[in-house]
A protein has these predicted regions:
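Predominantly long cytosolic amphipathic alpha-helical stalk/bundle segments
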Residues: 1-86, 98-110, 137-168
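Ser/Thr-centric signal marking residues that sit
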Residues: 79, 92, 125
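Residue-level detector of functionally special positions within alpha-helical transmembrane segments
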Residues: 85-88, 128
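Membrane-embedded alpha-helical transmembrane segments of multi-pass integral membrane proteins
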Residues: 91-94, 98
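Hydrophobic alpha-helical transmembrane segments and adjacent short intramembrane/lumenal linkers
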Residues: 107-121
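Hydrophobic alpha-helical transmembrane segments of polytopic membrane proteins
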Residues: 121-135
Length: 168
């Protein structure tokens, strides 16, 4: 049983939630297509190329909104991934400074005097890396997913434009 575009459109728009992803792109393109095809009089009807261009523009606008939504939190992950090692480095420098400060107050330096400051420095380094590594991995994964979805959305828009072209 073949599903018509009208039934698919009804299914997409019948939900309580706003469509997302390809459904949003489909809704925008088909809504514009229907609007242009159902012009009331013959004088105001548009030719096929204008109808198709209107549908393409509507799909492109929906596509851009979808990509904006997908990209919204990537800058935060990028910032965490790039800044965290520097915060860890700052903690390392602070810990080493404390270790040297502790040495300056004693006549003879021993490992037991230096070790707490160095341990503090290494903990700060580890915390910075603990935050940075997962953030960079997550950023790369999500950025790659956004790129793949972008290609899929563009392919969908081209294929759907061809379907609408045959319907006009």
């Amino acid at each position: 049983m073949a599903i018509t575009l009208n039934k698919l459109y009804e299914g997409v728009t019948a939900g309580r939630r706003k469509p997302q992803g390809m459904a949003s792109i489909f809704e925008a393109g088909f809504k514009e297509f229907i609007r242009h095809k159902q012009q009331p009089s013959m004088e105001t009807k548009m030719d096929v190329s204008d109808v198709m261009e209107g549908s393409r523009r509507a799909m492109r606008a929906a596509y851009n909104r979808e990509l904006d939504d997908l990209d919204a939190h990537l800058p935060f992950l990028a910032s965490v991934g790039s800044v965290s090692p520097y915060i860890g480095l700052f903690g390392t420098v602070w810990g080493i400074m404390n270790a040297f400060r502790g040495l300056s107050n004693v006549a003879q330096a021993t490992l037991s005097l230096v070790a707490p400051g160095i341990a503090e420095a290494l903990v700060a380094t580890a915390i910075g890396l603990f935050a940075a590594i997962p953030a960079v991995i997550a950023y790369n994964r999500f950025a790659s997913s956004v790129d793949r979805l972008s290609v899929r959305y563009e392919s969908f828009m081209e294929e759907f434009t061809n379907i609408l072209q045959r319907k006009s």
